[in-house]
C-alpha cells in the first residue's frame, strides 16, 4: 500500500522541483551568445560589466531599474539585484547596499543614486561621496589649414559649448594668413612629419584627474591610419591617498618633491589588481601652499586581473620627475578632475 502511494508522491515532488527551479535558480542554462559587434557604448557614469552568467559585456542596470541574472546591477555603485520574495526570482529591482547618503546642492541622495547636478554633469552618490563625469564632449580641436582659428562658444539654447571656425582677421593674396597656426608641443611622433598627406599632431597629456589615487589623463592625436583626431587616455596616480607624506619632509625644508616608497606596490582599478608589482615614483607635498605634480612622465601598459579571472590591459602613466609650484587648483573646486596642468617629456 505504502509503495503504491510513494510512487505518485515521488513523481509529484520531481515535477514540482522542475516547475519551481526556473523561478528559484539563476537562468544561466542558455549557451553564451554575444553580439558580433563591439561591446555596447554605455551612457556617462554607467559601468560596462560582464552579465551575471559571465558571458557577455552589458551596460549595468542603475538604481531602481529592473534587473535579471543576465542584466546585473552596477557593482561599482554598491548596487545589487533585489529579487524580493523567494517565489519570484526571475526579475528584481536594483537596490543600494547600506551606505551613507549624500547632500549636494541642497538635496539629499541615497547611496547608489545617480543624478544630474546640471546639464553638463552626471553624478553618483556612493556612501557619502559624490563623483561626477562630464556629459559634454571634452574633445580638443587642433588648428588646421581649413580651420586655423578654432574656438569653443556657447550657443543659444544649447548646454554644451561647440567648436566654431572664426574667419581670420588678415587675408593674403593666396588666402587667409596662418600666423596663428602653431603646433602644440608634442612628445613621441614628430609633429612636422608628413605621412600620406597627413600632418601628424599630438597634444601633451593632460594632468591626472585625481590629486591622489587612481585617475585618468588624456591627450588628442591624429597619429592613426585615417589621420582623424582621436582622444587617447591612460591611467595615472600622482600619489597614494593613504600616504602621509608631510612627515617625510626634512627639517628646514617646505617640500618633498619625490618621496621614496618603501616597498613595491600593486595598483587597483575597480576591484581589479595589477598582475605585477611596481616600484613606482610618486609626487610629494609642500607645507607652504605649493602643490607637487608630475613634470616628466612615460606611458607603459599594465595588466590587471579581476575577481572573475578576466585580464585587462590599460596604459598607465609612470612618473619620472615632479615639480612643485603655486599653480594649483582651487580648494573649493568641486570638479577638480577637470583641472589641467600640462606635463612635459612623455615618451609614449
UniProtKB/Swiss-Prot annotation:
Q: Which GO terms describe its molecular function?
A: heparin binding; integrin binding
Q: What residues does the IGFBP N-terminal domain cover? A: 26-97
Disulfide linkages recorded for this protein, renumbered to the chain, are 28-53, 32-55, 34-56, 42-59, 67-81, 73-94, 255-292, 272-306, 283-322, 286-324, 291-328
Main location as per UniProt? secreted
Q: Could you tell me which Gene3D superfamilies the record lists for this protein?
A: Thrombospondin type-1 (TSP1) repeat
UniProt tissue specificity: Testis, spleen, kidney, lung, heart, and brain (lowest level in testis and highest in lung).
Name all CTCK domain ranges: 255-329
- Chain spans, region Heparin-binding: 246-348
Provide the VWFC domain boundaries: 100-166
Report the induction information: By growth factors.
Cellular compartment(s) = Secreted, Extracellular space, Extracellular matrix; Secreted
Keyword Secreted included in the entry's annotation: yes
The chain positions of domain TSP type-1 read: 197-242
Gene Ontology CC:
extracellular matrix; extracellular region; extracellular space; Golgi apparatus
Keywords from UniProt, A to Z, are: Cell adhesion, Disulfide bond, DNA synthesis, Extracellular matrix, Heparin-binding, Secreted, Signal
Tell me a GO biological process for this protein. Answer: regulation of chondrocyte differentiation
Which stretch is the leader sequence?
1-25
* Keyword Cytoplasm recorded: no
Please give the family membership noted in the entry.
Belongs to the CCN family.
Query: What function is annotated for this protein?
Result: Major connective tissue mitoattractant secreted by vascular endothelial cells. Promotes proliferation and differentiation of chondrocytes. Is involved in the stimulation of osteoblast differentiation and has a critical role in osteogenesis. Mediates heparin- and divalent cation-dependent cell adhesion in many cell types including fibroblasts, myofibroblasts, endothelial and epithelial cells. Enhances fibroblast growth factor-induced DNA synthesis.
Q: Describe its partners and assembly state.
A: Monomer. Interacts with TSKU.
Name listed for the protein in its UniProt record: CCN family member 2
**Organism annotation:** Mus musculus (Mouse)
